[in-house]
Amino acid sequence: MADGTQFTERFNELLKQKNMKQVDLLTAAANEGVKLSKSQISQYVSGRAVPRRNIGEFIAMTFGVDADWLYGEKIAEKGNINMREFKKSSKLDNVLYDVRGPVVDEANRMEENGTHVLKLNIGNPAPFGFRTPDEVIYDMQRQLTDCEGYSTSKGLFSARKAIMQYAQLKNIPNVSIEDIYTGNGVSELINLSMSALLDNGDEVLVPAPDYPLWTACVTLAGGKAVHYICDEQSEWYPDIDDIKKKVTDRTKAIVIINPNNPTGALYPKEVLDQIVEVAREHQLIIFSDEIYDRLVMDGEEHISIASLAPDLFCVTFSGLSKSHMIAGYRIGWMILSGNKSIAKDYMEGLN
C-alpha cells in the first residue's frame, strides 16, 4: 500500500536532487503521451494526493528510481538515487572468527548437496547425540517460576556459591562470592574482561593456535593480540622462550587455554610454573580459559594455574557447556583470585 507521506517527501526530494521544476514534468509527460496536469503535480507536491499507479510509474521512470520505493514500499535500488551506505566498523578489519567463517559456509554448501558433514568447528555436544542429564532439565523447569525478574549483575547468589565451592576444590586462592561473575556463556565474560582492561595499543599474549574469540575480543577492545607458539613437536605446550621474547612494555596480560582448544593439550605443572614465573617477572595478569577442565582423559589431572600464583592477579574462566552438555543454556563464569589489591580499579571497571 502506498504511503502518502513518504511519497510526498521523496517526490519533493527528487525534484530538488534532479534540479527539476513542475513544468519539466509536464513537458516530459506530454512527450510520452501521459495525461498529467499542473494541478495534479501541485497536489503531489503539497501532499494532498498520491498519483495513480500508471502516473507514479511514469514519474519514477522520469526520475530514474524504483516506483515501489517512490510509493514508500521499499528502498531505492543501488544506483538509482544517492542513498547513504552503512559500512562495518573499521574495528572489524583485523577480526577473524574462523569457527563461523568461509570453511563453515563451504560445509553448509556441501550439506545442501547431500554430503554428510561432521561439524567439529564448535564444541556443541548436542548434534552428536550427547544429551543433557535429566536432573539438570528437571531442576531448570522447577526453578523457572522463580526466575522472572532480574538477578544481580554478577548472577544468582546460589549459583555463585556453588562456583566458589568448586574454586576451593581446585585450590584457587583468595576467592569470595563477590569475586565470581556468571555470564551468558564464557564468551560474554571474555569480551567483558578484555573491554574493561585494555586501552588502544595494549598487548595481550595469546596462544597460537588459539580459540579465535580471544584474539577477536582483544582486537575489538582496542588491544593487540601477540601470539606465542604452542609447538606440535613439543606436545603442543607453550614455548616459554617465545613468550619471553614477545613481552614488551605494552604487555598487560597473558592468556592460556588449558586444556587447550583446539589442540587438546593438557599442561603439566612444570609448564604452568614457568608461565607463572614469566607473569611474575613482568607483572602480568593471567587469564586462564578452563572450559574443558572436566573433560580430562587417561587418568590425567587438570591443574588450575591460579592455584600456583597466589601472589598474582588471575582470572579463571569455566562453565557447564561442555562438561554438562548444555551449550545452549549459556552458563559460564569467571573467577577473580590471588592478589586482588593490585587490580582494584580493574575490578571496579568490571562492575
Predicted regions and their residues:
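A short, Lys/Arg-rich alpha-helix, primarily the initiator
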Residues: 1-28
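Short, charged recognition helix plus adjacent turn
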Residues: 19, 71-83
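Short alpha-helical DNA-recognition segment
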Residues: 19-43
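Short, basic-rich loop-to-helix N-cap that marks the start of a DNA-contacting helix
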Residues: 46-61
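N-terminal small-domain helix-loop-helix segment of the aminotransferase-like
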Residues: 84, 93-185, 192
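Conserved PLP-anchoring active-site segment centered on the Schiff-base-forming lysine
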Residues: 196-218
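Active-site phosphate-binding strand-loop segment of PLP-dependent enzymes
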Residues: 232-300
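Conserved core segment of the aminotransferase class I/II
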Residues: 307-351
